[in-house]
């Protein structure tokens, strides 16, 4: 296995020599900007990368092909490059405090910085936006607090509202309420005239609804009566039973909808068949349960019903017969069984 001249495996040096060199001032550069290894031939082009240092170029080598700048993620803003003959330097001194808001380029930084210190109280309430995510805010370097991924932070609005609570200023409280509830901001701005107009519209709408309901119910009741009257007139007008039934139907239609104690609905019935019509349909059903289209048309003309009404009546009658036969069969089976 072969190593190049610049690899640390080919360079043979002891740890004691490093320690003795660290105790002396030979490992520090002339500008004292950061910790750099000496450009000696023993060290080659590699420094102590575990300590977060930058590689340096030896005096003998003009430029190395595989050499790249190894930037530690906690050393920010390494942008200044010098000539390849010299070592890389950073203008920022070592003793300066590293800001907490600086990350590498591939890490997504949060635009808002979480500030809980007293400096937040110095901000004016008008400068605090209602939606904190849209406006980026600069993170101060001297603030040691760490940004937290915030969906809603109470300190962003409560800090300003707390300072203005003692000043008794109504504008500050309104801005705080707008920040807490931005959707309901347009409601207090309604004028008194608009409120009166809305009340009038609601009253007029509530007054028109019962009249419409009564108008809708009355045509249905009126529409049901002429059909029954025409059917009864064709069958027999002189019979007293038909007259009594007609008078009862008129009384039912004239009376308003009954209360909840009686189980009667005020709407028109779904199958308004007279006694004569039901008798004729029952006779035909006893003769034949299933009708052809020609026979159904003849019956509908004789009974003064539509083709669809006769068809539906026969379907319902067949379902009723099926249900009755099932009940009778169950009753017979249970009667034959003896329980011990």
From Swiss-Prot:
One GO cellular-component annotation of the UniProt record comes to: cytoplasmic ribonucleoprotein granule
- The biased composition feature labelled Polar residues covers 203-217
Q: Which Pfam families match?
A: Homeodomain
Q: Which GO terms describe its biological process?
A: adult locomotory behavior; anterior/posterior pattern specification; embryonic limb morphogenesis; embryonic skeletal system morphogenesis; forelimb morphogenesis; hindlimb morphogenesis; neuromuscular process; peripheral nervous system neuron development
Positions carrying Phosphoserine: 238-239
Give the span(s) annotated as Disordered. Answer: 185-268
The reply to whether Transcription regulation figures as a keyword in the UniProt entry is yes
- Name the domain of life: Eukaryota
Annotated membrane-spanning segments are none
Q: Which GO terms describe its molecular function?
A: chromatin binding; DNA binding; DNA-binding transcription activator activity, RNA polymerase II-specific; DNA-binding transcription factor activity; RNA polymerase II transcription regulatory region sequence-specific DNA binding
What keywords are annotated for this sequence in UniProt?
Answer: Developmental protein, DNA-binding, Homeobox, Nucleus, Phosphoprotein, Transcription, Transcription regulation
Here the segments flagged for biased composition (Basic and acidic residues) are 242-253
Broad class of the protein's primary localization: nucleus
Similarity annotation: Belongs to the Abd-B homeobox family.
Protein function = Sequence-specific transcription factor which is part of a developmental regulatory system that provides cells with specific positional identities on the anterior-posterior axis.
Task: Indicate what this protein is called per its UniProt record.
Answer: Homeobox protein Hox-D10
Give the organism, scientific name: Mus musculus
Per the record, the gene is Hoxd10
